[in-house]
Amino acid sequence: MKLSVGEIVLSLDESTLRYQVEAAGIEWKWSDHFCPAILTEKGEIPFTQWKEIRHTEFSCGVGKGIHSTYRNYLGKADSYSFDTIVWVEEVNKTVHFEWIPICEKDLSIQQVRWPGYMEFEEGSKENYTLLNQGQGLLIPNNWAIALEKLSFNGQFLTSGGYMPWFGQVKHGAGYIAIASTPWNGGVYAEHPAGGPYTHVGTWWEPSLGKMDYRRCLEYTFLNNCDYNDLCKVYRNYVKEHGLFTSLEEKATRVPSVNDLIGCSFVHCGIKTNVNPKSDFYDPENPQKNNFITTFAAREKEGENLYQLGVRKMYLHLDGWAEPGYDNHHPDYLPACIEAGGWEGMKSLVDTMHRLGFMFGIHDQYRDYYLDAPTFDPAYATMLPDGTYPQHARWAGGPQTYLCGTQAPYYVRRNFTEILSHGIKLDGTYLDVFTCNEGDECANPLHRMTRKECYEFRKNCFDWLLSKGILSSSEEVSDWSMQSLVFCHYAPYHFMLQAPGTPKDGIPLPLFNLVYHDCVIEPWMMDKLSDTEDLMLYALLNGGAPYLIRDGAYANTDGSFSEGAALEMKENIRRCEVVAGLHEKVAKCEMVKHELLDDTGIKQRTTFSDGTTVTVDFAANHYEIC
């Protein structure tokens, strides 16, 4: 079956159920290795197993396409059934792929794998795939390193998929595939060592046990393009859909956004208290499990940094409350008594402000600790089978997850108490919200879909902003850009791995090509070796610098002990360079990124004010013009 809409020719092979799109004479076809399928607990079920499959050409007021119906699974009339609709929008030639559940009987679905991955077999550096794992990744088809499993299984709106799209370019022709229903979906990708191919496709998962709603992937095809063009397609998309809010707009809402621009970031803590049941508990070295730094000591450190010449700084404080870092959440008050209590904390905050610095705290409204004073399983996230997820990964030991419907209430309760003690917060970091997937809760008293969970998380950010407190979270995610002012970091994936780990592609600032002027991103500044200085990535991305980054967990989340130690004055000097650039370009669009050689050793970014940053990672050299 074949139909045309302008320069788009859409074809369906009715025997294999594979599609082909011809766009301005360039052919994009699903790989012969791809079979549309549903994955269940009992195995994979190809779409061809449905006994009654019909394809009908249709047209409507905005486009035309092919409507397919799948009925009579295993010959049963009253059985699991679904439709697919593939159509071309006439006004912009977007090709929409839609999978729609009709009758959800008899099958317990784990994933739907549709639409298919493209045939992309030529082992050429001119052919490459774009993935949104972390800040972004470009995989040439001839890349020597095999692609590892994606973080969070490639789930959209996690650190494995900051933005819900992927793309491919071959000899100057390309496509971007945008998930317009990203909440229960993700990508899977395969690239063997040396290529010659890269395959990338989409998976959809159930919501609260059922597929429940239409799943949509939108393809835009371009000629004479590169990855910059695909990013700008998505930038226009998020503007059209109301997801884009610039720092300029956020500063109108909360003027202190302007004060944060150009700051160096200091990340440190007060109290560590590792539960003996925690995976992090070290019985051989008990001194590592429990220790306290007083508020007064942190106050003195801030004064020392001022004496060394630091003038713009944001202090992010972990473990400031009595339970200790990652303990008893969401019941995380009062301020740590042994460290000085509310009075000591207020003195620290007041001193930071007297020095012209900004101050914020770490907090957590997802991890729900079983020993929290008000813990009640009735408010935990319930899975569809009635159970609750549990683990003891973090310092606080055994935990489950707080249902996201409850998070805004606890934010309001806790911060009302904090503010009542005269503590003026410039910012607050709500842990994991923009890194981990949204939760789903099957408890009928507070049922919540993943999409709704993101809205509840956003409500927490908005409440903070309403009080003049700048919102922050662990990483960055597409859903949060209306309400997130800054983050802990937005790194390339390799930065979260041990130094020296081979890169599974060329790190690329895909996120910043879309959202640079929407969010403030602090960057790690470690000089890992003579040929790996993370400062160059901070400059390339026009980001803010970390002056001190004392991670709560050693060798976790990019907090590694190895690396060349630099004197503090040298650290300050380096941060001044990065912060100075950030002050200049923070509100500018990153209009262009260039790879100046085949391996990404030399790169350049251009910002909308005309500023260019060129880096050479091998020579540890940068140039700002």
Predicted regions and their residues:
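Short loop/turn segments at secondary-structure transitions that flank enzyme active sites
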Residues: 105, 118, 321, 365-367, ...
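Aromatic-lined carbohydrate-binding/catalytic grooves of carbohydrate-active enzymes
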Residues: 258-413, 423-428, 434-446
